[in-house]
Amino acid sequence: MMNPDMLYVISPEEQNRETLTEILTAHPEIKFVSFMGVDFAGNDTDEKVPISLFLKDIDGFLEGMAAQTDGSSVVLTGIATLNNARVDMKIDSSVNWYIDYNYEHFDSATGRMVGTLRIPCFLVHNNVRVDSRSILHDTLDYVEKELLELFKKHPQIAGLEHISGEDIEKIIFTCATELEFWVKSPREDAPIEALSSSQMMQEQYWQRCRGNVRTALEQTVEMLEAYGLGPEMGHKECGGVRGQIDDNGHMTHVMEQLEGDWKYSYGVQTADNELLARIIVKEIFRLNGLEVSFQAKPVPGVAGSGEH
């Protein structure tokens, strides 16, 4: 599934006209561009713009507004209205761009999976950025500005007596997360009583994975590494029951709770990384015949999927 010759990430240093043209021309399997804005409900937009159109007007996409939509396509409650619905997408060149591959569609010329370059964007309404990513970005800028001013007024910081607040030039916010989720066989549900008993007896926590669950988890960790997220581990969580084996040796009645962990990052990049990780998890487990839920409480009465 992972190919070392394929492109997975384009860093901010490479997001200029010359380098992008060289990279995308060298990878003809990347056939589309998608501009990813995140609305107030956490939905990330996705489109399929031909790569030829992007390269033809690359300066316009990079410097101007990459695309536009109307307020009915995104959740911007109280902002985009019927008589003022235009929402523009402005490319964010301060974070990594990722190539999203279709595991079921192959380029006839190269034999590789067809890829879509996903470019994170800000959603702009009336020349004001109004999306979730911009709120996080602006909040961090504001907090940094206020803290730097505070440190200059009060240079002696408790616990940091060895430095002066006046010498602090920049504050870098780092953040990390863990992703818990439930996986199950489609159209098959485990009894709540069995799930509750298994949880009380701690039968599943950090236990060995088997069958397609193990395969999917291992493939997920490999893909997180390919995208540069720095995976640290994947393991079973406290919820779930043992799956069953059918006459052909395949796992059935799978119902398990898993967790994935990867390295910390900075500000908005951390949020983008989690969106990418969710897509990777969903796609890989689907290819292995399993459904994934990131809901906080998908199964009543048993452990939910926390995040901290």
Which residues make up each language-model segment?
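ATP/Mg2+-dependent ligation/transfer catalytic cores
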Residues: 1-236, 240, 244, 264-279
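Beta-rich nucleic-acid/ligand-interaction surfaces
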Residues: 18, 240-248, 255, 294-308
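Beta-strand-rich binding-surface signature
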Residues: 32, 178, 257, 289, ...
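Active-site proximal loops enriched in glycine and acidic residues that flank catalytic Cys/His/Asp
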Residues: 37, 262, 296-298
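Short, solvent-exposed loop/turn segments at the edges of secondary structure
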Residues: 114-116, 176, 253-255, 304-306
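Acidic, glycine-rich loop-and-beta core segments that form the ion-binding/anion-interacting portion
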Residues: 270-308
